[in-house]
Amino acid sequence: TPRRQGRVTLNPLAHLDPLGTILIIFMAFSGYGIGWGKPVPVNPGYFRSPRRDWVMCAFWGPLSNIILAVIFAIPLRVMLASGERLPDSVFVDFILSMVLANIGLAIFNMIPLHPLDGSKVLSGALPDIYDRRYWNFQMVYGPIILFGSILILPLIGLPNPLRFILLPAREFLVDLLLGI
């Protein structure tokens, strides 16, 4: 459990995944920002309805990002409601960065490729026969498709197909939150 692993803390060091941390540092120099933290351990033995509860558990991460984006968007929305342009300031830049980052994380994590949360949400929505096939496929090919799309394709000069999903969805949600 997270408590046994010393992860019930606000200390970010407790949540760093060694490979994810090294990769984000390395990738920052290449212009890509990809990395990850340790996944939150989940004990399905506590689930009353395992299939439904896996979906709910997977959905909470992206939902928490949306909630944070809404909270950070409130001051920007208030400023925009005054009819004035947003001032150029570190505060506004920080708040806008938090809105963009949290919306981006929510959308990215809902992509239905393993190990992202969207794979668990889709898996729970599928009938049992398709769920097993989907899950078997995702366990093997999900990470390959995901990392190939993010890392390999751009390195060989091809566009990342996930951008065609992520950027329009992020733009739509930012416009919705900020009332633009």
Summary of predicted features, one role per range:
Residues T1-I180:
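Hydrophobic transmembrane alpha-helices and their immediate loop junctions
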